[in-house]
């Protein structure tokens, strides 16, 4: 009898444990939505409803122009998912409607659309998994308002002024410093509404995944979207010189290849799907070939990211996988700038190193071609990094390589440096900030410039 009671008790215990666990697993569905208002006006919440689940964060009643907001729903019943719909409207009665369905069984699905596709664009990226996150954008095709961009470079985890940048001993101090920098930029965003950020290379110290993880951990806390490129520390300094033993990748090109693969993934899975206007890129993921350059329009300006520099090329082999072929971007750039010029845009180029490797390793013919593109297709400015020195140059024009384009160097994020660009039609004003102590301190104003 005693044994029977013990068996019954154990049986009931496991029954309770099973249903408790099942309920816990059944409730583990959520959808976090980030919505960026890239229009000219405030968006007003028109309607929001949930078919399944509850709100953990409700959609805000309004979204200021340039603002990014988040809202979230989660499951609250046994073996159910989350499903809902939210609609925002602009003053011209144009709407964006977001529908999400994250079921307990089956695939996630999303329907994001506008009732005025002639004037507006919608796009999204992400959305996979039980706890899904999607980034949604609502663009007006012809933005006329003024806007702001933060331009950065060289986060370079785990580099600081002291210590070994490749040592994990520098990890916590680097993260603390850069957490302050992010906090300062978010404060500036709350005051002045930054539409997006650009980071011009050296996203890691040597291309290692551990340092890339630190970058995302810290900089994904920015309250505005950002678009980055690679620098020499990501896929040039480490060629044939860096393995990822912890990931069982013993190729000496492991770190460089991972930097390239991650960049390609950002371009195809995020930037392109978020539907940056007139988006174009130069990389074929099928044959692993191209420069990784990409571009987009915002307002009257065409933005171009040229990665390390426009003439960089390298072959990144592997003992098991196909070779990656990084090629110069000049031919792609010529076609890209010509199309932007035909659309009536002024252009801004971004790349990492415009002072050392680009000048020293490019042929005279390549430098001549680059200058001709700048002069022919209304390139008004070039933003670079690499030197860790904030500066402006070519104020009077006539540079033998950059022509009459103004050159701005954004310093280094690991030092707290960044630039705030105020854009009015085809004119920009640029100010230098430092945020290493957690607050945005204005250092100086650079001379502005205008496109034609």
Question: Which residues does each PLM region occupy?
Answer:
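Intrinsically disordered, low-complexity segments enriched in small/polar residues
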Residues: 23-144
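N-terminal active-site segment of His-dependent metallophosphoesterases
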Residues: 142-211
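Extended active-site neighborhood of metal-dependent phosphoesterases/phosphodiesterases
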Residues: 162, 208-332, 369-375, 381, ...
């Amino acid at each position: 009898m005693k044994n029977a009671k013990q068996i019954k008790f154990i049986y009931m215990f496991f029954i309770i444990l099973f249903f408790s666990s099942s309920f816990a697993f059944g409730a583990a569905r959520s959808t976090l939505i980030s919505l960026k208002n890239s229009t000219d006006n405030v968006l007003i919440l028109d309607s929001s409803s949930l078919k399944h689940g509850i709100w953990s964060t409700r959609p805000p009643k309004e979204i200021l122009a340039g603002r990014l907001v988040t809202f979230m729903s989660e499951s609250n019943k046994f073996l159910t998912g989350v499903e809902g719909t939210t609609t925002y409207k602009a003053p011209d009665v144009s709407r964006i409607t977001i529908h999400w369905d994250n079921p307990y069984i089956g695939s996630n699905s999303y329907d994001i659309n506008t009732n005025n596709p002639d004037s507006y664009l919608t796009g999204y990226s992400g959305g996979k998994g039980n706890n899904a996150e999607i980034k949604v954008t609502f663009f007006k095709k012809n933005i006329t308002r003024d806007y702001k961009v933060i331009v950065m470079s060289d986060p370079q985890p785990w580099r600081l002024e002291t210590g070994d940048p490749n040592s994990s001993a520098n990890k916590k101090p680097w993260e603390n410093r850069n957490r302050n920098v992010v906090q300062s930029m978010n404060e500036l965003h709350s005051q002045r509404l930054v539409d997006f950020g650009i980071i011009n290379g050296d996203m890691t110290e040597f291309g290692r995944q551990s340092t890339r993880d630190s970058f995302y951990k810290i900089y994904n806390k920015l309250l505005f979207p950002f678009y980055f490129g690679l620098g020499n520390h990501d896929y040039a300094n480490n060629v044939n010189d860096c393995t990822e033993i912890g990931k069982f990748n013993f190729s000496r090109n492991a770190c460089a290849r991972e930097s390239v693969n991650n960049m390609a993934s950002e371009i195809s899975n995020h930037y392109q799907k978020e539907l940056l206007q007139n988006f174009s890129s130069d990389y074929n993921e099928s044959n692993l070939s191209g420069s990784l350059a990409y571009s987009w329009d915002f307002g009257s300006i065409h933005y171009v990211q040229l990665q390390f520099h426009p003439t960089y090329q390298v072959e990144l082999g592997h003992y098991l996988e196909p070779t990656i072929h990084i090629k110069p971007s000049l031919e792609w750039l010529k076609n890209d700038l010509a199309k932007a010029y035909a659309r009536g845009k002024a252009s801004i180029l971004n790349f990492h190193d415009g002072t050392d490797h680009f000048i020293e390793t490019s042929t005279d013919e390549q430098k001549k071609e680059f200058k001709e593109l700048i002069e022919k297709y209304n390139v008004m400015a070039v933003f670079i990094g690499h030197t860790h020195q904030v500066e402006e140059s070519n104020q009077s024009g006539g540079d033998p390589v950059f022509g009459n384009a103004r050159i701005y160097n954004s310093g280094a994020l690991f030092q707290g440096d960044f630039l705030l660009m105020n854009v009015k039609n085809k004119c920009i004003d640029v100010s230098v900030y430092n945020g290493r102590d957690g607050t945005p301190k204005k250092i100086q104003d650079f001379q502005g410039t205008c496109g034609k």
